[in-house]
Amino acid sequence: MLSVAARSGPFAPVLSATSRGVAGALRPLVQAAVPATSESPVLDLKRSVLCRESLRGQAAGRPLVASVSLNVPASVRYSHTDIKVPDFSDYRRPEVLDSTKSSKESSEARKGFSYLVTATTTVGVAYAAKNVVSQFVSSMSASADVLAMSKIEIKLSDIPEGKNMAFKWRGKPLFVRHRTKKEIDQEAAVEVSQLRDPQHDLERVKKPEWVILIGVCTHLGCVPIANAGDFGGYYCPCHGSHYDASGRIRKGPAPLNLEVPSYEFTSDDMVIVG
């Protein structure tokens, strides 16, 4: 009843405290007597009464700003004038500084500049990655002094007459050719003055039946094909250089003969290259 009186505002002084008994299933042992009194309940007048008028006086009187979005619930906040709105003009391009001007007119130029920067960055990153990978791969390979000292032993009995066998030596293809009697006579009869890189067949071999060459074309470094070409020796498919059975250039753009490495015969059936 006191709470009702507190919420009654100006009618609180005329209200009095009352008690009402409700009959129950059990009879009470002692009948409670409530003496009647005409005194008004004592209220704390210093305490503010929570009513509509008092709460309205405490509420802010400034206008509200409501925000609504599809991804977040609606919210209401007070409008603050002391907040500094961030300015992103320093990060914008001159073409889009004016907010009232359409950016579609300068979109092509801006896209072109972005594509140019992206392409330049991609090329730079690819070049740097290529150098890093090349350095990493070269660090795992043998050093130059080890490669210079490396040698390879070749068993000549494994190469039949008229055939050419390829080996890997110091990272390059090595050709070992077992020439027939016909090939030996044919290459020995070639006129040296007709050759682009003049060199006699006997200057390129230690034993006439064995020709040992580095299988790298002297034009642009391609690997020639054995037993091919117009002269029955080697043919480079990259740019059409023709070599004879002695490895001498006879036709095509290659300027020099195939290189002859250093080698020695340790026996009739064994040769060491390097």
Curated annotation (Swiss-Prot):
Enzyme's top EC category: translocase
UniProtKB keywords: 2Fe-2S, Disulfide bond, Electron transport, Iron, Iron-sulfur, Membrane, Metal-binding, Mitochondrion, Mitochondrion inner membrane, Respiratory chain, Transit peptide, Translocase, Transmembrane, Transmembrane helix, Transport
Mitochondrial matrix side: 79-103
Pfam family name, one: Ubiq-Cytc-red_N
Disulfide bond annotation, renumbered to this chain: 222-238
EC id: 7.1.1.8
Post-translational modification: Proteolytic processing is necessary for the correct insertion of UQCRFS1 in the complex III dimer. Several fragments are generated during UQCRFS1 insertion, most probably due to the endogenous matrix-processing peptidase (MPP) activity of the 2 core protein subunits UQCRC1/QCR1 and UQCRC2/QCR2, which are homologous to the 2 mitochondrial-processing peptidase (MPP) subunits beta-MPP and alpha-MPP respectively. The action of the protease is also necessary for the clearance of the UQCRFS1 fragments.
Family: Belongs to the Rieske iron-sulfur protein family.
Official protein name in the record: Cytochrome b-c1 complex subunit Rieske, mitochondrial
Comment field (misc): The Rieske protein is a high potential 2Fe-2S protein.
Transmembrane segments: 104-140
Biological processes annotated in GO: mitochondrial electron transport, ubiquinol to cytochrome c
MF GO annotations: 2 iron, 2 sulfur cluster binding; metal ion binding; oxidoreductase activity; ubiquinol-cytochrome-c reductase activity
Rieske domain segment(s): 187-272
PROSITE patterns xref list: RIESKE
Keyword Transmembrane: yes
Cofactors: [2Fe-2S] cluster
Catalyzed reaction equations: a quinol + 2 Fe(III)-[cytochrome c](out) = a quinone + 2 Fe(II)-[cytochrome c](out) + 2 H(+)(out)
Segments in the Mitochondrial intermembrane topological domain: 141-274
Gene that produces this protein: UQCRFS1
Compartment(s) where it occurs, according to its Swiss-Prot or TrEMBL record: Mitochondrion inner membrane
Membrane topology listed for this record: Single-pass membrane protein
Bound cofactor: record note: Binds 1 [2Fe-2S] cluster per subunit. Fe-S cluster delivery to the Rieske protein is mediated by components of the iron sulfur (Fe-S) cluster assembly machinery that reside in the mitochondrial matrix (including HSC20 and LYRM7).
